UniProtKB/Swiss-Prot annotation:
Cytoplasmic side: 1-34, 89-106
Topology of the protein relative to the lipid bilayer: Multi-pass membrane protein
Transmembrane segments: 35-55, 66-88, 107-127
Main location: membrane
Site (Calcium ion selectivity): E79
Effect listed in the UniProt record for changing E79Q: Impaired Ca(2+) channel activity. Heterologous expression in salivary glands shows inhibition of calcium influx
Lineage: Eukaryota, Metazoa, Ecdysozoa, Arthropoda, Hexapoda
UniProt similarity note: Belongs to the calcium channel flower family.
Tissues where the protein occurs: Detected in the imaginal wing disk (at protein level).
Name of the featured protein: Calcium channel flower
Organism whose genome encodes this protein: Drosophila melanogaster
Name of encoding gene: fwe
Domain of life: Eukaryota
InterPro entries (alphabetical): TVP18/Ca-channel_flower (IPR019365)
Amino acid sequence: MSFAEKITGLLARPNQQDPIGPEQPWYLKYGSRLLGIVAAFFAILFGLWNVFSIITLSVSCLVAGILQMVAGFVVMLLEAPCCFVCFGQVNEIAEKVESKPLYFRAGLYIAMAIPPIILCFGLASLFGSGLIFGTGVVYGMMALGKKASAEDMRAAAQQTFGGNTPAQTNDRAGIVNNAQPFSFTGAVGTDSNV
């Protein structure tokens, strides 16, 4: 068994089937899951740190810490439901979100990461919620899909739209009709030599 197969076996859920959508590379699929688990752990940890800011009477940092911890628990619930085996409905919730398109998860993670940063801008909220934001960005990139092949991009670039003439590819295609070339060999005939 190769190292990649061991890693994918550790990060795969029991009875998990491959998604029906466009195939993603294994390192992106499981790397995003691993990033989400790490992000959730640090969001909970730094959210707890922000909650302790009540000592300095900063209510906004207290609220930001609570929101960051909730976001960390939600991300952990969706990425690693095995951490919440004591709750019966966790697998159903994770499967429901798993069946949604990837851009749904990306939007959810990005939306959960922004309020703690706005409420209490500091290293703890920036790092904890920033990792969740990064996980959302990775899922957003996966939702966009991979780039088309070179042949497909060339074919799309050569298509004509609305009956226009095909694109000209010679060197003088962008020059205005009847334009005279510049000449630096002598003075222009209308120059007054002033």
